[in-house]
Design a protein with these regions (language model features):
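N-terminal binding-site loop/beta-alpha segment at the start of enzyme catalytic domains
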Residues: 1-86
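Structural preference for beta-strand elements that scaffold enzyme active sites
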Residues: 5-9, 45-46, 73-77, 131-136, ...
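Active-site beta-loop-alpha junctions enriched in small/polar residues
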Residues: 13-15, 50-52, 79-83, 137-142, ...
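Active-site mouth loops of central-metabolism enzymes
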Residues: 16-30, 101-117, 144-146
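Short, flexible, mixed-charge acidic loops at enzyme active sites
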Residues: 23-24, 87-99
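Short, acidic/polar
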Residues: 25-39, 109-126, 174-181
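Active-site groove signature of glycoside hydrolases
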Residues: 122-144
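Beta/alpha (TIM)-barrel catalytic core signal, keyed to glycine-rich beta->alpha loops juxtaposed to Asp/Glu
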Residues: 140-219
């Protein structure tokens, strides 16, 4: 992985998503692809997404936008812990791209070893790539899944890192308390923290940042 790709990255949470209880309607496919292409042409080479974002649409649109770009020139991050299932047919084990585009995707937590691997395999297919630069475990605090994270999710992520399917592993969360516990027990490469860290509000995050520096975990 080339760590000198860019200092800034583009997040894909708004692509196909309805946020803030419907206050923000998200970004459609045409605009999302335009944004991704503009970001790349402007020098941004780090792209972040997740199955949750747009219930599969964010990954799908990233894959379409970046399909003609040399893979080694970009850094792709996605997340695991949720599978996207078809609201119209609960028996479908894999939802089609067509139904994702139509908005029929529904996220379901699954921290089992099989669920984590399937999540990654489905993300790779949507993103049109054979590896991820970074794989983050998504929202174990929201699902009350801390024990499952230790028992099955992180071990499977580590195995995929050994296999070369992912280059770095970590977690993506809103608060710093659980990542602090994670770092004290397991080896992580990166953490995406969506909470606030400013000059005025950093008391809770100070311990977190110190541990990251000590453990050489990128934030």
């Amino acid at each position: 992985m080339n760590n000198n790709l860019s200092k800034l990255g583009l997040g894909g949470a708004t692509f196909g998503n309805v946020l803030a209880d419907g206050i923000f309607g998200g970004v459609n496919q045409e605009k999302a692809i335009e944004i991704i292409n503009y970001a790349y042409e402007s020098g941004i080479k780090i792209f972040d997404t997740a199955p949750l974002y747009g219930f599969g649409r964010s990954e799908l649109w990233y894959g379409r936008a970046l399909s003609g770009i040399k893979r080694g020139s970009i850094n792709l991050t996605s997340k695991c812990g949720r599978l996207i299932r078809n609201v119209r047919n609960k028996n479908d084990s894999i939802i089609s791209d067509i139904d994702i585009d139509k908005g029929y995707g529904e996220p379901v937590f699954d921290y089992s070893r099989d669920g984590i691997r399937r999540s990654v395999e489905e993300s790779l297919a949507r993103l049109k790539t054979d590896y991820l630069d970074t794989l983050l475990l998504h929202d174990p605090d929201q699902g009350g899944l801390e024990s499952e994270a230790y028992q099955s999710a992180f071990p499977e992520m580590a195995k995929m890192k050994e296999e070369g399917i992912v280059k770095n592993v970590g977690c993506g969360m809103n608060e710093c308390e659980m990542p602090i516990r994670f770092m004290k027990k397991i080896d992580l490469d990166k953490i995406l923290l969506a909470g606030r860290y400013t000059l005025l509000e950093n008391t809770k995050s100070s311990e977190f940042m110190k541990i990251c520096a000590k453990k050489n975990v990128k934030v």
